Amino acid sequence: DPDQALVQHIFDSLSLVTPVSRALALQPTESPTIVDVGSGGGLPGVILAIMLPQVHVTCVDAVEKKAMFVRQMAGVLALPNISAQHARIETLEPLESSLVTSRAFASLQDFAQLSGRHVRAGGNLVAMKGKEPTEELTALHAHTAWAAQAIEPLTVPELEGQRCLVWMQRKGTT
């Protein structure tokens, strides 16, 4: 159903733009970067690149066909601020990104353990989730060097389910 795809994928990805923009404005860098892990067909990475042209977005996916699709989208949409890498996130050299995002990628614990080394000092991991993932938060705190900094409710037009962003930072940072 095209209408449902619009809501579940495009509107859902658009709901990330304002919180991400706000967070990047607070970071002391002139060249903000985002790594979108498990990007699939480029959501939310392509949406972020369109809406935040001053930010470079790297979409990472383990499936080559999906990374190729993101590259094709970047060309068709003339987006100079996006790139795609076909790789498992844990195999890449540290990317030193301002934010590392995920949408439907993994548990918070797995996301932090696999992707945390790609966040520069002072940056954040940001996971899009449905309802507040209480059990995942417990595992995150118990088994990783990361802590939830905030859980931000998201409003997605036309979507009846709950959505939230889990903002994470390294333990011991403020």
Placement of each model-derived feature along the sequence:
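Hydrophobic side chains within alpha-helical segments
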Residues: 12-15, 39, 69
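Hydrophobic packing within well-folded, soluble alpha/beta domains
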Residues: 34-35, 48, 57, 70
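Short linear capping/connector segments at secondary-structure termini
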Residues: 1-3
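Conserved alpha-helix/loop element of class I SAM-dependent methyltransferases that forms part
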Residues: 5-30
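Conserved class I S-adenosyl-L-methionine
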Residues: 28-40
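S-adenosylmethionine
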Residues: 54-174
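Conserved SAM-binding loop of SAM-dependent methyltransferases across substrates and taxa
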Residues: 41-54
